[in-house]
Amino acid sequence: MKKSIRQIYYNAFSRFYDRFVALHSSDAQGAAREYLSNMVPASEGDRILDMCTGTGSLLLRLRKRLERGGLVVGVDFSRGMLHVNQKRTETYENICLVEADVASLPFPAQSFDAITCSHAFYELKGESQERSLQEILRVLKPGKVFFMMEHDLPEKPLVRAMFYLRLASMGAKSAINILRHEKMMLRRYFRSVEKVITPTGRSKIMICRK
């Protein structure tokens, strides 16, 4: 399969991804991801999907929630990210990695009890965002929740410049729409949408109930 420019970029970026996110969120110890994982309801036998799973930092926390039985599935289109992820997670039987486009998920309808996406949704372009939200609705069980964690506007000038550069890669119109109309966009798909600020104050979590 021919690789897109974005896949090539993320394959190369996989070696620096965790440090980049820590710098953006002022969260070197992963407190925001820990906070997110603790918000996700988990019962024995549940299946949780982590979209744009990257190098697996959130997966490792989510799998602890299902130690009594269940499965955490990580999906990413970047083989480089998944390679780093696999090195971290291959010893855990309740973690499964899948190389796929989140805009076309290879799972049956109503497969998951919760879905997460950490610091990645903003990077999906235009139609991919719309299709991804449609796919989330398709594979999420009725009444269950999609948790989307993203950076709030950074205070440090250098980090803010990097944040704007990241948004610019999405296209100006898409970036402005997300920043100004995030809740409105999500409410087109979900029954309820709530915004929570993480304890670090640098990230936000959108809690979207189907």
Regions found by a protein language model. Give the residues of each.
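Short glycine-centered segments of the SAM/dcSAM-binding site in methyltransferase folds
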Residues: 47, 71, 143-145
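A short acidic, Gly/Pro-enriched loop at the edge of an enzyme's catalytic core
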Residues: 103-115
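Conserved class I S-adenosyl-L-methionine
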Residues: 1-41, 57, 61, 162-164, ...
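Class I SAM-dependent methyltransferase SAM/SAH-binding core
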Residues: 49-104
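A short glycine-rich, Lys/Arg-flanked "PGG" loop and its adjoining helix->strand segment in the class I
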Residues: 130-142
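C-terminal alpha-helical "lid/dimerization" subdomain adjacent to the S-adenosyl-L-methionine
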Residues: 4, 147-200
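A short SAM/SAH-binding and catalytic strip from SAM-dependent methyltransferases
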Residues: 114-127
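Helix-to-beta-strand junctions that scaffold the AdoMet/dcAdoMet cofactor pocket
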Residues: 67, 124-126, 140-142
